[in-house]
Amino acid sequence: MSERKFFGTDGIRGKVGSGQMTPELALKLGWAAGRVLSRSGTNKVIIGKDTRISGYMFESALEAGLSAAGLNVMLMGPMPTPAVAYLTRTFRAEAGVVISASHNPYYDNGIKFFSNDGSKLDDNLELEIEAELEKPLECVESHLLGKVSRIEDARGRYIEYCKGNFPADQTLTGLKIVVDCAHGATYHIAPAVFRELGAEVIAIGDKPNGVNINDKVGATSMAKICETVLTEGADLGIALDGDGDRIMMVNSRGEVIDGDQILYILACDAKARGVLRGGVVGTLMSNLGLDLALQALDIPFARSKVGDRYVMELLKELDWRIGGENSGHILNLDHGTTGDGIVAGILVLAAMRRQNATLEQLTAPMEMLPQVLVNVRFEGEHDPLSSDKVKAAQAQVESQLGARGRVLLRKSGTEPLIRVMVEGDDHNTVLAHANLIADAVKSAS
């Protein structure tokens, strides 16, 4: 496959106004995508965005480019990424476009595409779009220009879809839940979903102003929701990221429940109901505790590369249904085509109701092993991971850890960093092992 120039593993992303994320590129990208997508004969594309102030600019540019290529555009306004995937399917659109940089700060933004079935756009189509980007923009004839309309009931449609994933004979009455929307795309969705299911909801991170998305709130900044759960005496907390495709949770003790623990809950619940197909897909960063806990239940576990795109690829290859990342991207292919933080939260709450159990009780059998991650910066073309010294240090640590530990060394995909991850039974021992390997990497750099 040819090397992609613009598209990364999750679309195009960067700092607004520099590099790739300019209105000029967005205009041309809309046109190029329109040229490729119109070949199928369908001429309808949906656009959604998160709450970044730059979203207005990129929405207008994409809209103009798609229209210039002859495609009709349907605007959703601020809506979660999984809502775009869902409504792309239900409106029988040729594609969905999301303007978001997910959990990044407000000054970043990104553009990613979904195919007509609500899954990430095929690599080959992205390459075709990149090829069109190299050509001069040519507008279709005036009578063929695309029209633009707005989906006025997008919010209500998606709320009903989310609620449909909760058992019809159950309610959340009696539960007090803190919901953190990260000042992002779920601010007008998530609190309503859980309230309509019967819960008492305390919403935080629900007042976006264009520049506060993910700012000390949301799934990547858990301190505020942990504190709020404790001060409000809530039963649990649900934290979403800026575009709503990621979830972290908090139990009544103010302890964070991460993506690995959520996967464990969902797998146990599916097995108990006899609907678990195959096993669970995690990533190279998934805690060894998840692997061991699933082994104890005879549930197969497989690891993909880091990234929800790779989790999805392995799920499809194995024909399994449940997978995700410890960072909170949760995939359940019986309930959607992409990571959906709200739906994942609903599925956990459904498991709690079915088993009449708390979050603490559902996660108790899974022992999270201490995990230490050390980032080591390197310069030049030399690969420190090929060093005999680094290999020797890794072998020494793996020998000492045995079956109750794990070492992972990998290069960052975005920075000149080697990530050293070590897991084991004792935090201090794991920290010492990680520093030993990190020192070897530094000396080899």
Curated annotation (Swiss-Prot):
One of its GO terms (biological process) is carbohydrate metabolic process. The lineage of its organism: Bacteria, Pseudomonadati, Pseudomonadota, Gammaproteobacteria, Alteromonadales. It holds the Pfam family PGM_PMM_I. GO terms for cellular component: cytosol. Keywords: Isomerase, Magnesium, Metal-binding, Phosphoprotein. GO terms for molecular function: magnesium ion binding; phosphoglucosamine mutase activity; phosphomannomutase activity. Activated by phosphorylation. This is Phosphoglucosamine mutase 1. InterPro entries: A-D-PHexomutase_a/b/a-I, A-D-PHexomutase_a/b/a-I/II/III, A-D-PHexomutase_a/b/a-II, A-D-PHexomutase_a/b/a-III, A-D-PHexomutase_C, A-D-PHexomutase_C_sf, A-D-PHexomutase_CS, Alpha-D-phosphohexomutase_SF. Mg(2+) binds at S102, D241, D243, D245. Its cofactor is Mg(2+). Its EC number is 5.4.2.10. The keyword Cell membrane does not apply. SUPFAM superfamilies: Phosphoglucomutase, C-terminal domain, Phosphoglucomutase, first 3 domains. Belongs to the phosphohexose mutase family. The active site is at S102. The keyword Endoplasmic reticulum does not apply.
